[in-house]
Structures are given as C-alpha cells and as structure tokens.
Amino acid sequence: MKRVAVLRGGPSEEYAVSMLSGSAVLKALRESDYPHKDIVITKKGEWLEEGFVRSPEKALEAVDVVFIALHGSYGEDGQVQRILQRKGVPFTGSRALSSAIAFNKELAKNTMRPHGLLMPKHRRIHRNELDRLDEEIPNIFKEVGKELFIKPLSNGSSLGARHVPNEAVLKESLLELLDTYEQVLVEEFIRGKEATVGVMNNFRDQSVYVLPVIEIIPPNGESMFSHEHKYNGQTEEIVPGRFSYHEKAKLSAAAALAHKVIACEHYSRSDFIVRDGEVYFLEINTLPGLTSESLFPKAAAAVGLNYTDLISHLIEIAHVQNR
C-alpha cells in the first residue's frame, strides 16, 4: 500500500483546525491499514516527526503520497505545494499556482469573472490607505453597496469575516482587521441563502463529480456563517439543501466551473449565496476542512462515501495523477 505522510498544524491562524483535520485523516489511515507518518508543522514553520525537528527532505523520505491537512497560509497558499513539487512527491489537493489563486479571494474572483458567474461587488482595501479612511468610507458604500461584508483578502474558516451594516461599523472593523491583515476585501452583502458545493475528481466514472449542495443556516437568524459557527455544532447544515431544481443545477454547474477554471485537483469546495433564483459565487477552497464537523465529508457521506473511503480515494487519485 501507499506510504502516506500527513501534514498538519502550520504557522497560520488555522493551526487548531488543521490539527483536527489531520487527526481525522490519521484515524482513517489506521482503519485502512495505510503505512503512515504524522508530520506536525509548528507555528514557527518547523517540521516535526515523532517530536523531532526534521528537514522536509528527511521527513519525506520513503513517502509515496503526502496528505495535506493544512489550512490557511503556508498550507493553502501554494507554499507547501511548491516544496512538494520541487521534491517530486505526490500530494493531495491542488498544485501551487492554483492554490495561490484560490487563496487570494480577489484574484480568484478576477480569474472567474470572464466565465459569466455572478459575484458580489467588491473593493480591496490596503493597510496603506488607513490615513485617508474617513474620506474613503462614504465612497466604499457608494461603490460597493448599502450593506457590506468584510474579510481578510487571504484567509480561511471565515476568520476575521464580519457583516457591516453602517459606516461606523465599517471604520471600526477596517481598523481592527488592517491591524492584523495587510489587505481586506469589502464586499456587497447579499441577503440570501448560503450554499456550499464540493467537487471531486475521478469518482464514479466522472472526471469531475459534483457532490450534493449543502444549505447552511447560521444559528439564531444571524447573517453569516462565522468561524465560531463552523465548529460549535450550532449551525444547521442541510444535505441536500432546500433549493429549487434550477438553483441546484446552477450551483452544481458553478462549482464544477470554478474547479476547472482555477485548475483545482482532486477536490475543492465553493461557497455561494442564492437570492431570487440567482447564484452568486463567493470563493473557492482548495483544501476543504476534514474535521468531524466539516462540510465536505458530510456531502460525501450523502452519496454513500464514508470518511475512510473518502480519504483513500483522495490518496489514490493523488498518487496516480502526480506520478
């Protein structure tokens, strides 16, 4: 059987989520009898194997496939993918360039724009614009919309994301986010139903297989699927989502299109808002979460693919496609 190294942890804010994803993957590998090793990347970026610091070259010795269970910067932005590509080691998920495009939310939008998908209007704000923030805030509302949503330009798990109903909240939120992040994305807030759609390669004789649409309902009527809601078990996630036939068809087609245009490999998950029968593309994730609370495994389970078999499938297609 393939010898698998699981990469988890990492220097991003999503260290804890990555550790959970990696732990779930390791459990699946034990159940499938894959020979494996657990490589934890510390918050400082050191690679640890059995508690000892190793160079990537040493840690990857005698490995057939790397399962990337990292999230956020370093894991999803193409950095670790570049390391693995240089070493010639097969790995799960998209290659470095596609990962970098998807991780930068504006770059992903601009890549998708010529392909006809609807998207919320947006504007990127850089930290160096802080000195003229007061004069720019009214312009932001005029350009983007009366109600806004802001998030870091490059991040995952909804970290830092928030709903902005007015100018006072926008200024406060921008000051807070730009203190941590160099750039943020200000988007038009579209009130509608949240949906997410997973895509997988080479499953059931389909080169691009679209999983059932998931409808996401945040608790207590809140306006967004926050980082806290993703992992506290309070959000209602309905598989398949309660969308019309035409809405589901649009969502599935849009997710498959994003997967192809960004040149994702093995698996991805795209997020959308549905309003009045129209589908708005928000972003694409090249390394969807794989914890017990994560959406991608739930969608796979809805078509009869259990977690252990999902992990095995990703390993096998990674080994074949990257040889």
Each PLM stretch: what is its role?
Residues 1-8, 101-193, 204:
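Active-site nucleotide/adenylate-binding loops and adjacent lid/helix of ATP-dependent enzymes
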Residues 2, 116, 244-323:
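ATP-dependent carboxylate activation and anion-phosphoryl transfer catalytic cores
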Residues 39, 184, 188, 196, ...:
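A short glycine-rich, hydrophobically flanked beta-strand micro-motif that places a catalytic Asp/Glu
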Residues 36, 90-91, 119, 148, ...:
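Hydrophobic beta-strand scaffold residues
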Residues 1-107, 114, 126-139, 316-323:
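ATP-binding N-terminal substructure of ATP-dependent carboxylate-amine bond-forming enzymes
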Residues 125, 161-166, 199-202, 275, ...:
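Short beta-strand-to-turn element immediately C-terminal to the catalytic PLP-Schiff-base lysine
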Residues 165-250, 279-280:
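Phosphate-binding site of ATP-dependent enzymes
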